[in-house]
Each structure stands twice: as structure tokens, then as C-alpha cells.
């Protein structure tokens, strides 16, 4: 099998969707991998699954579903979260500069796939990619409190918000001045047009 980048290992090369509990990475007899949804669609009219790349056939016994094909262990190794403990804390950096910890239970029998736990917390059908960070025990927050570094950075964040507001006010004032200047030029030209038949120059 050809060497793929780590990004391409995370997604099905047919539909380009990331692997998830609904789209498990299934290994064919020819050692190619694609998601269970694509394999199910390819199998709708056939008893066997034909590989879309090498045309190799993976025979499925009667009553055997695509879900029963083995998962690709290489792909699971790339997308699996390390089993440090029963509950590995996950820190998610949000656009609002907040950092929240989600304790995710990890089953040792199966790997945690993207979208398995964290994405269920999002409203609607939104999906966000999150980066799982292993945090040393000495840097973990105590009893759900914020880490010490986050507490120290809080005054800096307020300063950034104040400077951002101030720069916005300055931008509005600058735009208003430019508009007044342009309005002055237009009014001056209009007064010159009304006096064009006189001898006085509007220079």
C-alpha cells in the first residue's frame, strides 16, 4: 500500500469525510482502507465488495455486513487517544480565548474516534475538530479550577480587549474625518461649477 500523509489517514479517500463512529475505517482484503458508509454504498447491489483502487474483491459471507469487516489498525493508531488513565482530560481552546476541560472516558477495548464524545456536545449538526493535549499532572487545574497560567493571563486578556476597543474607536474617527474632507471637496467643486460663467477663478 502506498504511503499516505497523516491527514489523508484521518479521512476516507472516497468521500473525504473524517473517520468517526459512523464512518469507521474498514480494511479490505487488499489492505486498502475506506469508510464503512462508502463500502455499504458500494455493496448495495453486490454480495462482495470490490476495491475502488485495485479492483480486488473482498468476499462477504451471506448475512455478513460491512460493519463486521475489521477496522484498519494503522488508522486507529493515528486517531486514537493515548490511554493514560480511565479519564483523560481534554483541553479545548475556543475562539473566545476560553479553555475548558472535558473529562472523556476512554474504553480500552476500542479507540476513541473524532466525533465520538466531544462533537456530541456541540449544538445541531456542527462539527469542530479538537486537539487533544496530554497535560502533565503538575499543570492540571485543581478541582475544576483554572490553571495558574490562565489566571495570570486574565489581566492581559482584559488589556487586549481594551486596546481592541480603542483601535476600533480610532478607526471610526479616522473614517469620519476622511468623509468630511471628501464632502468639503465635493461642495467646493459644486460651488465652482455654479460660478463657471464668471470671471473669478475658483483656483
Swiss-Prot record:
- Say yes or no: keyword Membrane present: yes
Membrane topology is:
Single-pass membrane protein
Q: Where are the transmembrane segments?
A: 167-187
Write out the GO biological process terms.
apoptotic process; cellular response to amino acid starvation; negative regulation of TORC1 signaling; positive regulation of autophagy; protein K48-linked ubiquitination; protein K63-linked ubiquitination; protein monoubiquitination
Region called Necessary for interaction with RRAGA, residue ranges: 106-165
What post-translational modification does the entry describe? Ubiquitinated. Autoubiquitinated in vitro, leading to its degradation by the proteasome.
Q: Which reaction does it catalyse?
A: S-ubiquitinyl-[E2 ubiquitin-conjugating enzyme]-L-cysteine + [acceptor protein]-L-lysine = [E2 ubiquitin-conjugating enzyme]-L-cysteine + N(6)-ubiquitinyl-[acceptor protein]-L-lysine
Keywords in alphabetical order = Apoptosis, Lysosome, Membrane, Metal-binding, Transferase, Transmembrane, Transmembrane helix, Ubl conjugation, Ubl conjugation pathway, Zinc, Zinc-finger
Q: Which pathway does the record list?
A: Protein modification; protein ubiquitination
SUPFAM superfamilies reported for this sequence: RING/U-box (SSF57850)
Gene3D superfamilies per UniProt: Zinc/RING finger domain, C3HC4 (zinc finger)
What's the Enzyme Commission number for this chain? 2.3.2.27
Q: Which GO terms describe its molecular function?
A: small GTPase binding; ubiquitin protein ligase activity; ubiquitin-protein transferase activity; zinc ion binding
Self-association and partners? Interacts with RRAGA (inactive GDP-bound form); stimulated by amino acid starvation.
What does this chain do?
Answer: E3 ubiquitin-protein ligase that acts as a negative regulator of mTORC1 signaling by mediating ubiquitination of RagA/RRAGA and RHEB. Catalyzes 'Lys-63'-linked polyubiquitination of RagA/RRAGA in response to amino acid starvation, thereby regulating mTORC1 signaling. Also mediates monoubiquitination of RHEB, promoting its association with the TSC-TBC complex and subsequent inhibition. Also mediates 'Lys-48'-linked polyubiquitination of target proteins and their subsequent targeting to the proteasome for degradation. Induces apoptosis when overexpressed.
Protein name as catalogued: E3 ubiquitin-protein ligase RNF152
Can you name the source organism? Ailuropoda melanoleuca
- Gene name on record? RNF152
Amino acid at each position: 500500500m502506498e504511503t499516505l500523509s497523516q491527514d489523508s489517514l484521518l479521512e476516507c479517500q472516497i468521500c473525504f469525510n473524517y473517520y468517526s463512529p459512523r464512518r469507521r475505517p474498514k480494511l479490505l482484503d487488499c489492505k486498502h482502507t475506506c469508510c464503512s458508509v462508502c463500502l455499504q454504498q458500494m455493496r448495495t447491489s453486490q454480495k462482495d465488495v470490490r476495491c475502488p483502487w485495485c479492483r480486488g474483491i473482498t468476499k462477504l459471507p451471506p448475512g455478513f455486513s460491512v460493519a463486521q469487516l475489521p477496522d484498519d489498525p494503522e488508522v486507529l493508531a493515528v486517531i486514537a487517544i493515548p490511554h493514560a488513565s480511565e479519564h483523560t482530560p481534554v483541553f479545548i481552546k475556543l475562539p473566545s480565548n476560553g479553555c475548558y476541560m472535558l473529562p472523556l472516558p476512554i474504553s480500552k477495548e476500542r479507540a476513541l474516534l473524532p466525533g465520538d464524545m466531544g462533537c456530541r456536545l456541540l449544538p445541531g449538526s456542527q462539527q469542530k475538530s479538537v486537539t487533544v493535549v496530554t497535560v502533565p499532572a503538575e499543570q492540571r487545574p485543581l478541582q475544576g479550577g483554572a490553571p495558574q497560567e490562565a489566571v495570570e493571563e486574565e489581566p492581559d486578556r482584559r488589556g487586549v480587549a481594551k486596546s481592541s476597543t480603542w483601535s476600533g474607536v480610532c478607526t471610526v474617527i479616522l473614517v469620519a474625518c476622511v468623509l468630511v474632507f471628501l464632502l468639503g471637496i465635493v461642495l467646493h467643486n459644486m460651488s465652482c461649477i455654479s460660478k463657471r460663467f464668471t470671471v473669478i477663478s475658483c483656483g
